[in-house]
Amino acid sequence: MRVITRFAPSPTGSLHLGGARTALFNWLFARRHGGQFLLRMEDTDQERSSETVAQSIIEDMAWLGLHHDQDVVIQSARRERHTQVAEELLARGKAYYCYCSEDDIAAEKLRHENEGKHYRHHCPSRDANHAQSGTAGVLRLKSPENREIKFTDGVYGEISVSSEQIDDMVILRSNGHPTYLLAVVVDDHDMCITHIIRGSDHITNTIKQMLLAEAMGWDNPQFCHIPLIHDEGGAKLSKRNRAPGVHEYRELGFLPEAVCNYLLRMGWSHKDEEIITMQSATQLFSIEKIGTSHSCLDSKKLLFLNHHYMNQKTELEILGLLLPFLEQELGHTVAETKLARLSLGVKKLMERAKTLADLARDSVFYVQNIPISVDDDAKQVILKSSELLAKLVGAMSQIEPKTWTKDFLSSYIKEWTKSNDVVISDVYHLLRAAIAGRLSTPSISEVMEILGQEECISRLRFFLNS
């Protein structure tokens, strides 16, 4: 049997971390077994679904490297097929039309809840084998009576639910539109899905979907439910209490390798390894290694992973990834000559930067035109050091261009401070402030060598004359 998995998001909102992890686990399982990973857009909620959102989900998945096989299946385009199955269930006596009003059902349900009882809707039309003419009703599947419904979950083991807990579910609305539950079962069957990996909040749906497949005489896929992701404090994520989506992590400057590694370790493990590449994961991934406890967001771990993967890149690779963030920081494109300058200093800056956005902010001084941006601390240093600034302009101008190297600059500055009775830390602070616009940089002598004598003196003069 060839393994076929699927990811089936609803295009009503961006790809969040829980959805991305579900997609990742399905993708890895398919790749691990030489199978296929399919993508289906579950857009039965036509009012809230958006083609733009669907496209953004596809783009975010591609950014993560989770490329799907075959064409994307659009659920709403298969409405005729879903309706056909519903009519077949009606013809087989497995479904019936219900004409009870929603208000009456809600009132009856509330009465049972107030009495501490479970409400299971019993429609007077349950045993009728035809629709009432001129009346709009919903089509319901007949749930079994007095039976335990069981299945072996790939993560949680055996799960059992009494049929008395399962309502006769609606499969066609009164307007004739198929419901989500019906569409999912039909699509999974027609797409030959063998394994479904999804969040544990779907277990109730799974029981109902199993009954639908059973009524049609279809085999059920292997279900694997994974624990949900909680926030850093251990609370469940919700619409109000949500984590950034995949697109937001992209904009914050995280690498797809880091996000995938992070998602993988939220629920799945291999020994005590934290760094697991996708290449390794496709060889190691198995359902058996998924835990049953919920996972919590850990921003420090994500930053650690991102820092690691950033430092696996070459200077050329990093520059390509960094360029959009630099241009956003600057508000304009970066000249090739300035990128070449940055390439000489970017590795040092990567030692501390955790994201591409961090790296862009830390490295922007290499590619800025005069006047460069200056943070508040650097401004204060410049404002109170005008006399020292004038002396430094003169001192830097006396250096022979051919000797403008980090080693010479380092020794020259030390000697100059001694002979001029100046505190060396004051000199370094001022050079950083006026040349880099901040007080924290790699070795200022190294920065000055990369920028060059002319650029450094021009920056010093600008602040002297301001």
UniProtKB/Swiss-Prot annotation:
Q: Where is this motif: 'KMSKS' region?
A: 236-240
Q: Which residues bind ATP?
A: K239
List residues traversing the bilayer.
none
Q: GO molecular function: any one?
A: tRNA binding
Main localization (coarse): cytoplasm
Where located? Cytoplasm
| InterPro entries, per the entry | aa-tRNA-synth_I_cd-bd, aa-tRNA-synth_I_codon-bd_sub2, aa-tRNA-synth_I_CS, aa_tRNA-synth_I_cd-bd_sf, Glu-tRNA-ligase_bac/mito, Glu/Gln-tRNA-synth, Glu/Gln-tRNA-synth_Ib_cat-dom, GluQ/Sye
Q: What is its EC number?
A: 6.1.1.17
Keyword Ligase appears in the UniProt entry: yes
Extent of motif 'HIGH' region: 9-19
Q: Which reactions fall under this protein's catalytic activity?
A: tRNA(Glu) + L-glutamate + ATP = L-glutamyl-tRNA(Glu) + AMP + diphosphate
Task: Set out the biological process GO terms recorded for this chain's protein.
Answer: glutamyl-tRNA aminoacylation
Q: Quick one: a GO cellular component term?
A: cytosol
What's in the keyword line of the UniProt record?
Aminoacyl-tRNA synthetase, ATP-binding, Cytoplasm, Ligase, Nucleotide-binding, Protein biosynthesis
Q: What does this protein do?
A: Catalyzes the attachment of glutamate to tRNA(Glu) in a two-step reaction: glutamate is first activated by ATP to form Glu-AMP and then transferred to the acceptor end of tRNA(Glu).
Which family is annotated? Belongs to the class-I aminoacyl-tRNA synthetase family. Glutamate--tRNA ligase type 1 subfamily.
Q: How does it assemble?
A: Monomer.
Its protein name is Glutamate--tRNA ligase 2
Species annotation? Anaplasma marginale (strain St. Maries)
